[in-house]
């Protein structure tokens, strides 16, 4: 019983170590290669065991020194289920291995190519599929339209006719949609009919204007002619009156002296009367000339008056400009005074906060500073003093201490303000020079 159990156990162990190869899987390469190597080891083990068996006793087991596995080797009469790997079987396996090696380089690229082709077919973008379907539908619709045209027309249409038909259809579609057609070239060309009509209209308008002016001109011309004739008639009438007066005077003289003895007296009288008439004519002419000269002088005076008026207007405008300039100067001085007032207020706060002057003179200085600020606020300070203070402030902002010191030295001589106010200003500016500016430069 123990021997039978041992035999069964050995068979099961060997079956697990060397499972039998099924008939269908003999063609696969990796399993055949995996099975080929262990039999070789087994054969070598069996050969070693066969050589070692005669040295031991017949009933004893294999020696433990040469055991290569945990399980004991197969007994002498054990026959496995699969065909024993013999020496004659090894060349077949070797030949089959050679065949597989020969077939591998030819078979593998084909399989790879097939797999690549399959992968391309399997993985497709859905967008491409939709595009292909749309293209197929378009092609089918075009084929249907072509077939319908061939059935309807019966005769083939040339390309030129097709192009013209397409243009007509496009024009019809545009008109139906309400789209404006392109501007024709004729609209930009010269149009003789319209221009002739316009020319006729302009000519008619000119003729009408000419008629109107001709109708209006006679009245004006008539008035001017009447004026000229009146002036000429007045001159002629004055000359005729003079001649008639002369003749009447001569007749009176002849009637008064009919005696021959008085002919000489008549001659003398005529001569005297002629002299008198000449003198009268001269006086009249002088009076008329005086009137004319007076009228001319009046006209000249009227012409010269604009110059006087222009001079008067220039004087007025000069006065206005002077007033404007004075107003501008006042505004500038007020702005300067306002900026100086703010500057002095801030300086006063810093000066008395630091406690630079703790003597009894500090109270008087504070009172003088208040008076100075009141004058600046009320704009009662002279513009010259304001300009000097503004100049000193600009020098302080520029940090030009040398020029500022020189200006402070010259300030009491050139300013017109009281000495107390001048002391306040010199104290404030010197405070800036000695205390504030050095701190800023050190920072």
From Swiss-Prot:
Residues 205-226, 250-266, 297-332 have a biased composition (Acidic residues). Residues 15-333 are annotated as: Disordered. Residues 109-124, 159-176 have a biased composition (Basic residues). InterPro entries: ERICH1 (IPR026719). Keywords: Acetylation, Phosphoprotein. PANTHER family: GLUTAMATE-RICH PROTEIN 1 (PTHR22444:SF1). This is Glutamate-rich protein 1. It comes from Homo sapiens.
């Amino acid at each position: 019983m123990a021997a039978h159990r041992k035999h069964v156990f050995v068979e099961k162990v060997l079956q697990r170590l060397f499972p039998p190869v099924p008939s269908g899987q003999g063609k696969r390469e990796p399993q055949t290669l995996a099975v080929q190597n262990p039999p070789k080891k087994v054969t070598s083990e069996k050969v070693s065991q066969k050589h070692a068996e005669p040295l031991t006793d017949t009933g004893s087991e294999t020696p433990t020194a040469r055991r290569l596995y945990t399980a004991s080797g197969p007994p002498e009469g054990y026959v496995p289920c699969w065909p024993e790997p013999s020496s004659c079987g090894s060349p077949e396996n070797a030949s089959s291995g050679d065949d597989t090696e020969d077939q591998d380089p030819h078979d593998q690229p084909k399989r790879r190519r097939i797999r690549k082709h399959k992968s391309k077919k399997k993985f497709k973008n859905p967008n491409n599929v939709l595009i292909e379907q749309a293209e197929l539908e378009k092609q089918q619709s075009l084929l249907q339209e072509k077939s319908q045209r061939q059935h309807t027309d019966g005769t083939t249409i040339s390309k030129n006719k097709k192009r013209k038909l397409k243009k007509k259809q496009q024009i019809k579609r545009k008109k139906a949609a309400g789209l404006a057609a392109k501007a024709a070239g004729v609209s930009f060309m010269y149009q003789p009919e319209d221009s002739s009509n316009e020319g006729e209209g302009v000519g008619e308008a000119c003729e009408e204007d000419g008629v109107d002016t001709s109708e209006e001109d006679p009245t004006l011309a008539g008035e001017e002619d009447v004026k000229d004739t009146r002036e000429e008639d007045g001159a002629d009438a004055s000359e005729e009156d003079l001649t008639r007066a002369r003749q009447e005077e001569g007749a009176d003289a002849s009637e008064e002296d009919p005696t021959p003895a008085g002919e000489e007296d008549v001659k003398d009288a005529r001569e005297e009367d002629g002299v008198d008439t000449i003198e009268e004519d001269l006086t009249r002419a002088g009076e008329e000339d005086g009137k004319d000269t007076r009228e001319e002088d009046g006209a000249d005076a009227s012409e010269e008056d604009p110059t006087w008026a222009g001079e008067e207007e220039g004087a007025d405008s000069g006065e206005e400009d002077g007033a404007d300039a004075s107003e501008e100067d006042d505004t500038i001085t007020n702005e300067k005074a306002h900026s100086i007032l703010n500057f002095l207020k801030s300086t006063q706060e810093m000066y008395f906060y630091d406690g630079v002057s703790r003597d009894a003179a500090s109270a008087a200085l504070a009172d003088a500073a208040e008076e100075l600020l009141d004058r600046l606020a009320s704009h009662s300070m002279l513009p010259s003093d304001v300009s000097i203070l503004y100049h000193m402030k600009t020098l302080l902002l520029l940090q030009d201490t040398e020029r500022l010191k020189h200006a402070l030295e010259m300030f009491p001589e050139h300013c017109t303000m009281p000495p107390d106010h001048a002391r306040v200003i010199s104290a404030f500016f010197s405070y800036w020079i000695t205390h504030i500016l050095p701190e800023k430069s050190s920072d």
